[in-house]
């Protein structure tokens, strides 16, 4: 699959079905909210493996392409895999940054 500007990707069994799924994030700091077409630019996706070697793509976020890193782990200690995404928080233009250094996406599966 194509993900323009993909800067980080991690694999784990995110949905608890025994196979490996993928999260991927985008870092394109020059894409701004006022850039034509930016509202369609995916910045965070989940690739669910539905059968061996076949993935379904889910867009979790668009138009926020300021993620230089991501990681997976059980950050809330509930037994499933959560996602934390690092954000660019310093730039020349305040509107080209995100407010928080990192954002935790809790897995609501349990």
Regions found by a protein language model. Give the residues of each.
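Beta-propeller-forming repeat regions
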Residues: 1-110
